[in-house]
Amino acid sequence: MITIIGSGRVGTAAAVIMGLLKIDTKILLIDIIKGLPQGEALDMNHMSSILGLDVEYFGSNEYKDMEGSDLVIVTAGLPRKPGMTREQLLEANAKIVSEIGKEIKRYAPNSVVILTTNPLDAMTYVMWKSTGFPRERVIGFSGVLDAGRLAYYAAKKLGVSPASILPIVLGQHGESMFPVPSKSFIHGVPLSRLLTEEQLKEVVEETVKAGARITELRGFSSNWGPGAGLALMAEAVKRDTKRSLIASVVLQGEYDVRDVPVEVPVILGRSGVLKVLEIELSAEERQKFMQSVEAIRKLIASIPSNYLQ
């Protein structure tokens, strides 16, 4: 069974897409708002019936109902509002994530955890600490979304399908993240050879600012992109596809970084992160990567210690 904690826009989008992809036959929605997850589950069950899907949705306000889940997806947290940075969400969401982590440890101690709560990398650290799980089973979602956005904007410039691009985005899910055109390929040819310097600059800027742009346009943050990315990660875990994806994971010596969650390429399977892939970076790329790592370190250092137990 897959449990999704948080029945807002991202959680429900993920639930719908996972149902359409038939990733599991049982999907549980948990939320603190009475009636919300139950109503969403009922509506989704009607969808399943109409489409002939062998997927059943459940709604609950009780964490104990996640017992037996092998995958827990956490989308709960305060949303990012127009003009708000991810860092401003830090303390409030650290409290929420810490409390949820303890409940996951209690009721789903063998699960793989994927979370979307912002600021993402710092919240991945909070979840890792509060559950006490191995780093392989606590995964920050954002890299799939960032890589997908890079592929979209690069494809628009080149007039090709986004599916033909293998994108790499590293660092923090936030203002210091950086796409790596020299390591993003179309059939072995890097984007840095296919796009002009000006085009590359535009693609990178569009990728970094994509989330804020969506929020500016409609007044609330993205949900369909994150929902699709979560479904892709859930599929890798549930079906043990051993697929390479970009995800935020606590590094333990890779890239000469320790105890900091950072967006990097990983192999994802049934037990979570099976391998962290280390790609060769130029001196300039490594400098940007380490700047991103330091930005995450500063966020982690500002988290109250009582949320890290």
UniProtKB/Swiss-Prot annotation:
Pfam families: Ldh_1_C, Ldh_1_N. It catalyses: (S)-malate + NAD(+) = oxaloacetate + NADH + H(+). It comes from Pyrobaculum islandicum (strain DSM 4184 / JCM 9189 / GEO3). NAD(+) binds at G6, S7, G8, R9, V10, G11, D31, N93, T116, T117, N118. Disulfide bonds: none annotated. Substrate binds at R80, R86, N118, R149. Optimum pH is 10.0. The keyword Oxidoreductase applies. One of its GO terms (molecular function) is L-lactate dehydrogenase activity. One of its GO terms (biological process) is lactate metabolic process. Belongs to the LDH/MDH superfamily. SUPFAM superfamilies: LDH C-terminal domain-like, NAD(P)-binding Rossmann-fold domains. Homotetramer. Catalyzes the reversible oxidation of malate to oxaloacetate. Exhibits higher specific activity for oxaloacetate reduction than for malate oxidation in vitro. Has a strong preference for NAD. Can use NADPH for oxaloacetate reduction, but activity decreases more than 90%. No activity detected with NADP(+) and malate. It is an enzyme of class 1 (oxidoreductase). Its EC number is 1.1.1.37. Optimum temperature is above 92 degrees Celsius. The lineage of its organism: Archaea, Thermoproteota, Thermoprotei, Thermoproteales, Thermoproteaceae. The active site is at H173. This is Malate dehydrogenase. It comes from the Archaea.
